[in-house]
């Protein structure tokens, strides 16, 4: 039986509050580090991570530290897996009565560095490797997307709380599709080859630059579908649940060794089979190693 403090609704509330607090922190720190617009590298505030084109900033690490400190106060003893600070290597091995918090302090760091208003704080609560609650704060828009298993998906903004539903599109040719690209040259080449096959099949394609926001846009009906290779669990832990609870069909590949990351697909139900068949036809459901 689920402990009362592990009920999805309660975990969602924790995630929503933390995401909103962290988003406010990110907005303030960005102004301190970069000024009103991008100013160089913020005097050394940006460094490379997995490749020269994969940045991490002092604000990423500061924000994750804030979230870890808050969770230590609110949920002492809960394991934490964060993009910058690491955590359990296998979240599925966590005891069934324990919640693991999966954190991405800034999803869309390149956008953040350049001052493009599409980056997010993502917080997922997982039990046995399955997300049961989560929240994604769109930092620049000052909105929070959230969901809990069986309780639907919602958007909270200055006007209140709104139920999210994905679109009713039923033809792939009329779908607005989101996607993203990895950081390694090899991965990008393979992704570009696949995209060349997919573009003629859809209405148009958007590259937002944040997997968490892409998934939330599917939930909100601002995209009809989204797919991407090389996604990490912290990128999609919250967003995938939000899309699913809004009615989207969501596919997450099984993690594999070798650093390939996950294949993530989310689509309005009326086009999901058609999109999955198209991706399968061009070998687009297989992970792409870095």
UniProtKB/Swiss-Prot annotation:
Variation of activity with pH: Optimum pH is 8.5. Exhibits a dramatic drop in activity at low pH, with less than 50% activity remaining at pH 7. In contrast, the activity is extremely stable at alkaline pH, with more than 50% activity remaining at pH 12.
Gene disruption phenotype: Strains lacking this gene show no difference in colony morphology and no differences in levels of phosphatidylinosotol mannosides (PIMs), lipomannan (LM), lipoarabinomannan (LAM) or mycothiol (in the absence of exogenous inositol).
Thermal behaviour (record text): Optimum temperature is 80 degrees Celsius. Loses 80% activity after a 2 minutes incubation at 70 degrees Celsius.
Cofactor: Mg(2+)
One protein family per Pfam: Inositol_P
Function: Catalyzes the dephosphorylation of inositol 1-phosphate (I-1-P) to yield free myo-inositol, a key metabolite in mycobacteria. Is also able to hydrolyze a variety of polyol phosphates such as glucitol-6-phosphate, inositol 2-phosphate (I-2-P), glycerol-2-phosphate, and 2'-AMP, albeit with reduced efficiency.
Complex formation: Homodimer. Dimerization is induced by Mg(2+) binding.
Record's protein name: Inositol-1-monophosphatase SuhB
Protein source organism: Mycobacterium tuberculosis (strain ATCC 25618 / H37Rv)
Gene that this polypeptide is encoded by: suhB
